Amino acid sequence: MVHFDRHGGRIWAEPRGRALGYHWPQYSIHRGELQMMLLDAVRARLGEDAVRTGTVFEGFEQDGTQVRARLLDRASGTAETVAADALVGADGLHSAVRAQLYPDEPAPLWNGIRLWRGITEADPILTGRTMVVMGSNATSKIVVYPISMRTERRGRALLNWAAEVRLADDRLDWDPDWNKAGRLEDVLPYFADWKYDWLDFPALMSQAAEILEYPMVDRDPVDRWTFGRVTLLGDAAHPMYPIGSNGGSQAILDARVLAHELAASGDAAEGLLAYDKARREPVNAIVRACRDMPADRVLHTVSQRAPQGFTSIEDVLSPDELNTISGAYRQTSFSDVEALNSRPSYTAAR
């Protein structure tokens, strides 16, 4: 990962995955491809009818032995009640399960940033595997990174890009929706001159087949996910700003820990409580941290001190400041590497 100012000046770089010392690589993958991989795996293990679509969750009741979910088939209008040992609400930012658990919760909180995202096939940038972060979220910022090894093998890159713009008007005038279509003419003016020897960002946006637009929102952390035989997972449990690749990654970790605790406990209610205990506080800390990331503070400082760009980052940040950035990063990263590499697997004993 390499951080640049808005003019293309290199600020600092951070290794990732095996380059940092982890036992495992770091992957960036198309969300739809990952979802289809998971769908295929679920059907292979649980049967073709294990996943149902077009069904609306309308509520639940529970007692000491089971939970009953009320469902509605969108196409036929048929109502149905399904009983189970546990109910996991993994239904996103507008979670209906969470709404029943927290009926008085206010609307999602917006930080004033509007975000446009797209995917474009293009020539590789920098090493071909680099994640680029450029600009400042105090004004405008972009993130670009490759998400397909198949495209890489053809000498091309499938680049996922995000463009952030902080607006003067902090009123959220539409309902947050991860699938709202965006318009090139709305975002292009903010980045019309973001062109560099190795990246033409206006062209990258213009060549995307589809653009999505949404506000950067989260919710305040809650002090409980699990209620008896019902729990929350992913954005339903901890919606956070999409910073640091944490949104989807934390949902995957939720699922991994949940599966481990359910298998280890042998009792659904106990497993849900153990999952809540293991995950909630660490993830709530990430939700709060995403509101004020140290990396974003550095990018903002550079943009304030050198609004027209710089020749050398040493002219903008003092040696002590650079050492503080790299030292804090190393301390956090390498301690995490050691802990993760030595931690027992979440795979439950069979």
Placement of each model-derived feature along the sequence:
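Conserved N-terminal helical subregion
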Residues: 1-102, 106-119, 170-173, 180-185, ...
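Short, flexible helix/strand-to-coil boundary loops that buttress conserved ligand/catalytic motifs
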Residues: 14-15, 101, 202, 244, ...
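Glycine-centered loop/turn positions within well-structured domains
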Residues: 58, 67, 95, 140-142, ...
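Histidine-centered metal-chelating micro-motifs
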Residues: 95, 115-117, 139-143, 237-238
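Glycine-rich, phosphate-binding/catalytic loops in enzymes
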Residues: 100-107, 154, 248-251
